[in-house]
């Protein structure tokens, strides 16, 4: 894949169930208040370590608030060598309203 794909929450849920990596690029306070269960918080400070330790061929889902900022972050990851990147349309807000039981709270790991 030479560029990322935009996908709806339903497809993201299926990919997540198959083991896709989920990264949340919202601010730490928003992440702590609620995020997709199993998502890793990613910001300017943690992205280098994430890239260094990542499987570049693993499906990677990028989530933001509403599905806009995640597109830029997904494009960045593709530029860093990731081959299977998805931006989740509607972001966490749509995910939370669609799958409230698939969310978690707490601070980044």
UniProtKB/Swiss-Prot annotation:
One cellular component (GO) term of this entry: cytoplasm
Compartments reported by the entry: Cytoplasm
Alphabetically ordered keywords of this record: Cytoplasm, Transferase
Disulfide bridge map: none
Pfam families referenced in this protein's UniProt entry, alphabetically: Rhodanese
InterPro entries: GlpE_sulfurtransferase (IPR050229), Rhodanese-like_dom (IPR001763), Rhodanese-like_dom_sf (IPR036873), Thiosulf_sulfurTrfase (IPR023695)
Catalytic site: 64
Main location: cytoplasm
Gene3D superfamilies (UniProt xref): Rhodanese-like domain
Domain Rhodanese: 16-104
EC number, UniProt record: 2.8.1.1
Keyword Transferase: yes
Lineage: superkingdom: Bacteria
Keyword set includes Protease: no
GO molecular function, one term: thiosulfate-cyanide sulfurtransferase activity
UniProt-listed HAMAP family: Thiosulf_sulfurtr (MF_01009)
Protein name: Thiosulfate sulfurtransferase GlpE
């Amino acid at each position: 894949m030479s560029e990322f794909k935009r996908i709806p929450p339903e497809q993201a849920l299926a990919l997540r169930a198959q083991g896709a990596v989920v990264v949340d690029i919202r601010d730490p306070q928003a992440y702590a208040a609620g995020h997709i269960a199993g998502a890793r918080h990613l910001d300017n400070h943690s992205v280098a370590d994430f890239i260094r330790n990542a499987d570049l061929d693993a499906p990677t889902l990028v989530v933001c608030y509403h599905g806009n900022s995640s597109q830029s972050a997904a494009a960045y990851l593709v530029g860093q060598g990731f081959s299977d990147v998805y931006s989740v349309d509607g972001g966490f807000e749509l995910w939370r309203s669609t799958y409230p039981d698939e969310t978690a709270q707490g601070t980044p790991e």
